[in-house]
Amino acid sequence: MGYSYRQAGVDIDAGNQAVELMKPAVKRTVRPEVMGGLGGFGGLFALDLKKYPEPVLVSGTDGVGTKLKLAFQMNRHDTIGQDAVAMCVNDILVQGAEPLFFLDYLAVGKLVPERVAQVVGGIAKGCELAGCALIGGETAEMPGFYDEGEYDIAGFAVGAVNRPDLIDGSQIQAGDVLIGLPSSGFHSNGYSLVRKIFTPDLWEKNYPELGETLGEALIRPTRIYVKTVLPLIESRKVLGMAHITGGGLTENIPRILPEGLGIKIARSAWQVPALFTLLQRLGEVEEAEMLRTFNMGIGFVLIVHPEDVDFIQTQLQAAGEKCFVLGEVSGQSEGVSYL
């Protein structure tokens, strides 16, 4: 009797079972433009050319980094997929694009159908929050490649914007105003440092300033800003945007500025959430290091003309969204200055 693929560590039947388990969640993400269902060699999406007569496709790909280690150690697999979606769709939103569809890549050492379905369920939830369709993906069983119970996840998002509506920051000028939207925590960045300071023995501990266990605060999924920001983009009053990921406010905002411009941010403009101050205190992390590593409670930034600030604030408040006027664009020096 010769060897079988299953004996080598790859269970095709388990893969098929995982597909059946994930189908209901995937089905909830379908948009009218989607053609066909799961199981094809490629995902099909018919772009609405009435809505996008001059389409520019915007794409983004990302993973969730070492935040995965928390999911493994906490045995929490239902939200990490939302992180993967958020990291991709928030990036393409910066260019003014509406996310249209998403594909995922999940690699495992041993395929456990129920766990795979949990992960993909989180991806589907993220797609629902972003309004995009999950039109395909790949689940790869790779025996001997990952430790027991571990996996890796990555995503790929495609969106569209009409060419005249593309947002590239080129219209930003000195005196324009920064408006920040709150994050839900560390999002998916800085977890190598987070895990160095917040060791697993602390995750079940209740810190009064957090109002929950540390573990719950750490595993909370990345916010998806699409449905909050798209209406603002449609108002044509947004000059530039930044998704605050690795590098924090310090590194990410300058990426969208024309040459010769910088940013002045008032540190008193918002209260840094307790999760960040707790990490800074326990790890004795310097302020500058915090600001160039973490989002510090601000997950997304809009830049608008001064005369449009009230309009943007009113729109956000009507949508139940908090926002903070962080500072302004400066013509005096490049980079970010904290006041």
From Swiss-Prot:
Listed under GO cellular component are: cytosol
User: Does the record's keyword annotation contain Ligase?
Assistant: yes
- Write down the EC number: 6.3.3.1
Q: Which reaction does it catalyse?
A: 2-formamido-N(1)-(5-O-phospho-beta-D-ribosyl)acetamidine + ATP = 5-amino-1-(5-phospho-beta-D-ribosyl)imidazole + ADP + phosphate + H(+)
Q: What class of enzyme is it?
A: ligase
Its pathway, per UniProt, is: Purine metabolism; IMP biosynthesis via de novo pathway; 5-amino-1-(5-phospho-D-ribosyl)imidazole from N(2)-formyl-N(1)-(5-phospho-D-ribosyl)glycinamide: step 2/2
PANTHER family noted in UniProt: TRIFUNCTIONAL PURINE BIOSYNTHETIC PROTEIN ADENOSINE-3 (PTHR10520:SF12), TRIFUNCTIONAL PURINE BIOSYNTHETIC PROTEIN ADENOSINE-3-RELATED (PTHR10520)
Question: Family per UniProt?
Answer: Belongs to the AIR synthase family.
Q: What is this protein called?
A: Phosphoribosylformylglycinamidine cyclo-ligase
| Organism field | Desulfitobacterium hafniense (strain Y51)
Which lineage is the organism of this entry classified under, starting from the top rank? Bacteria, Bacillati, Bacillota, Clostridia, Eubacteriales
